[in-house]
Amino acid sequence: MTKVSKERLKELEESGDVMELNLGPQHPSTHGVLRLKLRLEGEVVLSCDPVIGYLHTGVEKECESRTYHQVFTLVDRLDYLSGPAEEQAFAGALERLMNIEVPERAQTIRIILLELSRIASHLLWAGTSALELNMSSVFMYSFAEREKILDLFEQVSGARMFPSLWRIGGLAKDLNSDFISHLKEFISGFQKIWKELDRLLTDNFVWCKRLQGVAVIDQEICKQYMCTGPVLRASGISYDIRKAYPYLGYENYNFDIPTHIDGDSYARYLVRMEEMLQSISIIEQAIARLKPGVVLTNDRKVALPPRKELARSMEAVIHQFKLISEGLHPPVGSVYNCVESARGELGHYVISDGTPKPYRLRVRSPSFSHVEVLKKVLRGHVISDVVVAIASVDPILGDVDR
């Protein structure tokens, strides 16, 4: 859609015929309980003021009364579409603070699950965004593929959206015997579906007209609002935590960082589509690198002993009793650990006072920046573009409010 010029905007503001409209907090197009206070003159948006807080759960404060092991079940519900990324951000912070070496097999499995989570999140984004523009076929294709990923998560962890599989020093359990075969089957089918989604959307006249030129977020705005992830890369800045600050051995994987220079909603769509292919490439490399071994550190001051040891080792029983009753005791200090989630830089800042519970947990959310940037980019657009703009930055309100 065409954006109104600054001169025309000034005329509309001086006309005096301005209407205030609340979009949300209960509206299907806001992707959560987000409220936008819009000032309109006719169909033209004069200003946009995002109002957050409707999904505030106090998770950061709640973590202060939970042991480090219990925190995992809380943090993966913040960005509820990227639970593995939340768990990796927190686990990685503790592992850095305590100098814990994660077994190689556990690192590789973590990468597989993180990239599957990224693909699932982008599929949900593509499906819901297309549905808002009455493209139901894309919605059905996307959700059918996402369902297969959720089945894979259920197979390995027993849960579909909140795996809670991460542990400090590794993973709760290893992959079952047929997981890799099912994963390869998914990869083979997904590449065909990706081509179909690309055919349905990339050159679609309606899709292009509705997205191109809408909510342009250039490099200066990205820096001003600290945007990351696909929003940043769609403006032409090639920045990805997996490349800039590698973790879990990402530096040993060959993958590209998709970028585009237009900075509009269509560019963000292209970045996410290309990211899904890069994630598939990373998963295939991880499968090839997967070697037999343990998936949890053998440091008994950090990790519970295997169940089979409890029946024959008094030392294992003592370690389990002390770890459960007294908890984990990280050294006094603080650490910031960030990962590349589906939405951008997700960071956990953990302060330890030496007790079994965090003194403070602060979450750096990518969605918060992307919601705030809407006030900058929606001015001058027509109201029908607001829905497209919200979808294009892909906010998760559980990640915003915390």
Swiss-Prot record:
Q: Report the EC code(s) recorded for this entry.
A: 7.1.1.-
Its lineage opens with: Bacteria, Pseudomonadati, Chlamydiota, Chlamydiia, Parachlamydiales
UniProt name for this protein: NADH-quinone oxidoreductase subunit D
TM region(s), chain numbering: none
A Pfam family annotated for this UniProt entry: Complex1_49kDa
Q: Which species expresses this protein natively?
A: Protochlamydia amoebophila (strain UWE25)
| Reaction equations catalysed | a quinone + NADH + 5 H(+)(in) = a quinol + NAD(+) + 4 H(+)(out)
Q: Which Gene3D superfamilies match?
A: Cytochrome-c3 Hydrogenase, chain B
What SUPFAM superfamilies does the annotation carry?
HydB/Nqo4-like (SSF56762)
Q: Name one GO molecular function term.
A: NADH:ubiquinone reductase (non-electrogenic) activity
Task: Keyword check for Membrane, yes or no.
Answer: yes
Carries keyword Nucleotidyltransferase?
Answer: no
